[in-house]
Amino acid sequence: MVPLFGLFCIFSQLYSLCSAYVDITSGYQVFFNLPTNMTNNQICWLFQASYYDIYSDKSGRTLRTGRFEPGDQQSLIYRDTLVELEAITDSYEYSNLDLSTYNGPEPYNSETDYCTDIMDLVMRVYDEEGHYVHPVANNSTNACAHPTPPTLNNLLISNYSDGRNYKESSI
């Protein structure tokens, strides 16, 4: 008789081979228009420091950075489809945002974990195959507002170095 743990391991290996899920290990897999060489913690902070621009894009895919110097304002745009980290190439669309020009109430602090609270929101905007399906928030000006009820809430997020929702990557 095969122990239950052994069966679980076999089924989980088979499942991972057949799964269409994308393992999110970097914000670069989720957003266009990010500055080069940001850590995931910085990406998560930037997400929180941004707001939905419902006047120019009612799909909910576009967020604008807030409280930066005029030359450093930009948009974060959800990808149509999540991509594997290996698929991101030199042709990726980067911007040149300077985080030091932010003049909002809570500037970036490297000691703070900005990712724990937002990954559930990111999970809710993509379906199981990694396709964008709906906006995170309805008519919200805050990127961290309560999300719309999810249609699919089981995007696989795994392999985190600290047991939390996101891990730092080398990008």
Swiss-Prot record:
Disruption phenotype: Leads to elevated levels of Ty1 retrotransposition and Ty1 cDNA. It is found in: Cytoplasm; Secreted. The keyword Glycoprotein applies. The keyword Glycoprotein applies. Residues 1-20 form the signal peptide. Its main location: cytoplasm. Keywords: Cytoplasm, Glycoprotein, Secreted, Signal. GO terms for cellular component: cell periphery; cytoplasm; extracellular region. Glycans are attached at residues 37, 139, 159. Transmembrane segments: none annotated. This is Secreted protein CSS3. It comes from Saccharomyces cerevisiae (strain ATCC 204508 / S288c). The lineage of its organism: Eukaryota, Fungi, Dikarya, Ascomycota, Saccharomycotina.
